[in-house]
Amino acid sequence: MQEILSAVDAELFGVWFLIGAALVFWMQAGFAMVETGFTRAKNSGNIIMKNLMDFCIGTVMFVLIGFSFLLGEDLLGFIGKPGFDIFTAYKDFNFSSFVFNLVFCATTATIVSGAMAERTKFLSYCVYSAVISALIYPIEAHWIWGGGWLAQLGFHDFAGSCCIHMVGGISALIGAKILGPRIGKFEKDANGKVIKVNAFPGHNIPLGALGVFILWFGWYGRSEERRVGKECRSRW
């Protein structure tokens, strides 16, 4: 009986992982709508394509490199052992866990897009998306969720406040600092002193509001998956 209950529990947990992954993936649309709605219309195409490429490029890099760095066998508490289990051991591979971690990776990359809106070359952003999906997010997330050195010290990250939001926020801050303000944002006198700050209002407030609600809804997939997932694993 215990074996049957354990098998059912494992299947239910896998289904819940996929439901949570679908909700978190839906947040990509929310980020795109918020960023597009609260910026100028002329940049809409660039913004939509950047958010789309986050997931497209991120998926390829996460499959080839990132996932093994994140959840591979721990090497010195710093990084997961590189491997291709998704191709070589696919019969025993946990695809539901892979999909959920993939959408988390894409979310981390997307956070940066809004901070650098209207002043980022598309190709440059694609390169950034590849780097954060293949190296930055997988390695730092391994420290906590992959049994790395922070996990060994007892550090916990319930739903990505550190692995996702802190890392995405720091990356966004660095990117914004390098790029500087949008052209025309500040008017300066001959001495370089700012004499006027120009506002760049968003071109579609309802679109931005729709994005907020999409993000709100998707958040339940992120937080509730972690909470209910723990209950499922300990129920029996």
Regions found by a protein language model. Give the residues of each.
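Hydrophobic alpha-helical transmembrane bundles of multi-pass membrane proteins
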Residues: 1-227
